[in-house]
Regions:
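Walker A/P-loop
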Residues: 49
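Helicase motor core with emphasis on the C-terminal RecA-like subdomain
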Residues: 6, 10-15, 19-23, 27-46, ...
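Basic/polar N-terminal segments that are highly enriched at the extreme N-terminus
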Residues: 1-3
Length: 367
C-alpha cells in the first residue's frame, strides 16, 4: 500500500478507520513528515504508534521500528497487515526460511515497515539487506529503555545512534509513556534529537478513566479475597502483578482451589510458553493473568478492566507503566495496590543485594 502525498487525516481514515486525531497526533505526524526529529512522551492508550505508522505509510522508502519485545512487534505487525499495510518483523522466533524471505522483501522493496529489536543490528545479513533501501524513518518504541535511569534499561538501546548512522541518519522519532526528566535528557542526548528542529511533545500522565486506589491488607488471605472479589465483579480482562515468582505460584494454587481459571506469565517460563500465554490473553474476552513485571510492556489490549498489584512495585515508573495496560478503550477501569508493609522487606532486600556493603565483599574475598 502506497499513499504518498496523501493528507495524514485521509490516511488515518483509509487505513485505520478513524475520522479525527487525538491529542497532538496530527501535529507530531506533520512535524515528522517535515523531516524533523521528535521525542513523544505521552500516556498509554493515546495512540502513539500512529505518530510513526502514518508517516511510514505516506513517505517513500522503508521505515525501521525498533521495539524491545518480540511479542509486541508481532501484535503490531499483525494489526497493520489486517489493514493492508506491508509490514513485517524479523526476530529470533523466525526460522531460517522465513527470515530469508523477509530479508528478500527488504531488498526488493515490498516491505514498507520493518520491526526489529536493537540486537538485530548485530547481524550483518540484516544490515546488508537494508543497504540498498532508502530509510525514510527510524522509530524507537519504548525509548525509556535507552536510559540507565529507566526502569527497563536495555544496553543495545544505547547503540541506536550507531545503528542510525548505518541507516544513513534518517528522521528519528522516539516514543515512551514513562520518562522522568533525567530519562528524557538521556534519550535526547543519546539519539541527538535536539539536532536541527527536533522537538519534544509531552502529553502528561493523566488517564482520567483509570480509578486508582490503595487497600491496606494484613495477610495473603485478604489479598486473595480482594482478587476474587474483583474477578467476580468486573466483566473483562484483568492482570494481577506480583514481585516474586514464588508468590505468584502460591496465589495461582489458591485461585485454582477456588475454581478461578487464569493464566500465569513470568520470566521462569520458556519463551514458547510465554508467547502462548500472551496470545491466549490477547484473544480472550474475560481472561485473568497472574504476572511478574516480565509481562506487559507494549501490551495493547483494549478491554483490560482491572490491574491489581498484589504487592508493592519496584518503582513508580514500573507502577505507571503497568497500570497503563488498563482502560485503553477509554472505559472506566480499576487499578488497585494491595499494601502490606511486610512487602517492603522484599524491596529492601533487593536494594541490599544490589548494593552490598564492605563487610559482604570482605566475606566473599575470604571464601
Amino acid at each position: 500500500m502506497l499513499l504518498a502525498e496523501e493528507e495524514p487525516v485521509k490516511v488515518l481514515e483509509k487505513c485505520f478507520g478513524y475520522t479525527s486525531f487525538l491529542w497532538k497526533q496530527e501535529e507530531i505526524i506533520r512535524h515528522v513528515l517535515g523531516k524533523k526529529h521528535a521525542l513523544v512522551v505521552a500516556p498509554t492508550g493515546i495512540g502513539k504508534s500512529l505518530c510513526y505508522q502514518i508517516p511510514a505509510i505516506i513517505n517513500d522508502g522503508l521505515a525501521v521500528v525498533i521495539s524491545p519485545l518480540i511479542a509486541l512487534m508481532k501484535d503490531q505487525v499483525d494489526a497493520l497487515k489486517r489493514r493492508g499495510i506491508d509490514a513485517a518483523y524479523i526476530n529470533s522466533s523466525l526460522g531460517r526460511e522465513k527470515r530469508e524471505a523477509r530479508y528478500a522483501a527488504l531488498r526488493n522493496g515490498s516491505c514498507r515497515i520493518i520491526y526489529v529489536t536493537p540486537e538485530r543490528f548485530r547481524k550483518t545479513d540484516f544490515t546488508e539487506a537494508l543497504s540498498g533501501r532508502h530509510i525514510s524513518l527510524l522509530a524507537v518504541d519504548e525509548a525509556h529503555c535507552i536510559s540507565e535511569w529507566g526502569h527497563d534499561f536495555r544496553p543495545d538501546y544505547t547503540r541506536i545512534r550507531e545503528f542510525r548512522q548505518v541507516l544513513g541518519n534518517p528522521v528519528t522519532i522516539a516514543l515512551t509513556a514513562t520518562a522522568t526528566p533525567e530519562v528524557q535528557k538521556d534519550i535526547i542526548k543519546t539519539l541527538c534529537l535536539d539536532a536541527g528542529e527536533g522537538k519534544m511533545f509531552h502529553g502528561g500522565i493523566d488517564r482520567p478513566n483509570l480509578h486508582l486506589q490503595v487497600e491496606k491488607v494484613f495477610s495473603n488471605d485478604e489479598k486473595l479475597e480482594h482478587i476474587i472479589s474483583v474477578v467476580n465483579k468486573y466483566y473483562g480482562n484483568g492482570i494481577v502483578y506480583f514481585t516474586l515468582i514464588k508468590q505468584l505460584n502460591d496465589f495461582s494454587d489458591m485461585l485454582k482451589g477456588h475454581g478461578i481459571s487464569h493464566l500465569c506469565y513470568h520470566g521462569g517460563l520458556e519463551r514458547v510458553q510465554r508467547s502462548k500465554v500472551q496470545e491466549q490473553f490477547m484473544r480472550g474476552k474475560k481472561t485473568l493473568v497472574l504476572a511478574t513485571n516480565a509481562f506487559g510492556m507494549g501490551i495493547d489490549k483494549e478491554n483490560i478492566r482491572f490491574v491489581t498489584h498484589a504487592d508493592i512495585p519496584g518503582s513508580i515508573e514500573s507502577y505507571y507503566q503497568e497500570i497503563g495496560r488498563a482502560g485503553r478503550d477509554g472505559k472506566d477501569s480499576l487499578c488497585t495496590l494491595l499494601y502490606d508493609e511486610h512487602d517492603l522487606l522484599t524491596h529492601m532486600n533487593f536494594i541490599k543485594w544490589n548494593n552490598p556493603d564492605a563487610e559482604y565483599f570482605q566475606r566473599v574475598y575470604h571464601i
